[in-house]
Design a protein with these regions (language model features):
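Bacterial Sec-dependent N-terminal signal peptides
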Residues: 1-24
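Beta-propeller blade termini and top-face loops
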Residues: 21-247
Length: 247
């Protein structure tokens, strides 16, 4: 009788354990029923303030390809209309970009102005102008390293050696590379063709599509301190040139 009782208890224990395991298997998480196979991890930038888009440039010869400049997440490239993006600026000295421009004469030549064109406290600064001649595979710093914030780059539609750069200049200090810069040798040297003062930079430029010698430049006088922000001073204004920046 004692042997029978022991065997019965052993059988009941095994049955209870098997039932418990079955119950655990049947208890599934609600998300287990959702297919997540199509989702993949992706980088959204190295900083808390990432995600701000500074500029976008679309390849005029291939509308599936474009470049996205972010304020604190580098530069991204897509070759399939945005289905997938690849970071192409992560190995450079600046992760903040203010603008991206494709050479209208050669879509493999890309220009990047580092340092976002923004005046808020969490603004990220850059270290000048970068150029790629292989569609973003490699980069060279072309100068204007103390500009810190660049708003726009324009390449002459008929002459790739002529480039204009709108340099806003440092936000937290005076001086630096600020104003409208022009290069006539593909970015090897730069000439400041519109210099207002040590607190005023050029935030944007537009070229007349009918005449590349005609450009409009907007200037912005601003300075941020720990305790306040001063912006829109007398140096701010709108300028026009009809001779490619000579006057």
């Amino acid at each position: 009788m004692k042997k029978f009782t022991t065997l019965l208890l052993l059988f009941l224990s095994i049955a209870a354990l098997a039932y418990s395991q079955k119950q655990k298997k049947e208890k599934t998480h609600p998300l287990d029923d959702i297919s997540l196979n199509g989702l993949k991890w992706r980088s959204v930038g190295p900083a808390l303030t990432s995600g701000r888009i500074s500029d976008i440039a679309v390849n005029p010869n291939n509308f599936f390809e474009y470049y996205v400049a972010t304020s604190s997440g580098g530069v991204w490239k897509t070759t399939n209309s945005g289905l997938h993006y690849e970071p192409i600026f992560d190995n450079e000295n600046s992760y903040s970009t203010g603008c991206v421009t494709i050479d209208p004469n050669n879509s493999s030549v890309i220009w990047i102005g580092t340092g976002e064109n923004n005046n808020q406290r969490s603004v990220s600064y850059g270290d000048g102008v970068y150029k790629s001649t292989d569609a973003g595979k490699s980069w060279s710093n072309m100068g204007l390293k103390s500009s810190e914030h660049i708003g726009k780059i324009i390449v002459h539609p008929k002459n790739s050696n002529i480039i204009y750069v709108a340099a806003v200049g440092p936000l937290w200090s005076k001086g630096g590379d600020r104003g409208l810069y022009k290069s006539e040798d593909g970015g090897k040297t730069w000439n400041n063709v519109l210099n207002i003062d040590e607190h005023t930079g050029v935030s944007d430029i537009v070229m007349d599509p009918r005449d590349p010698e005609v450009l409009y430049a907007s200037t912005l006088q601003r300075r941020r301190h720990v305790y306040t922000y001063v912006g829109g001073g007398p140096g701010s204004g709108l300028y026009k040139t009809t001779d490619g920046g000579n006057s």
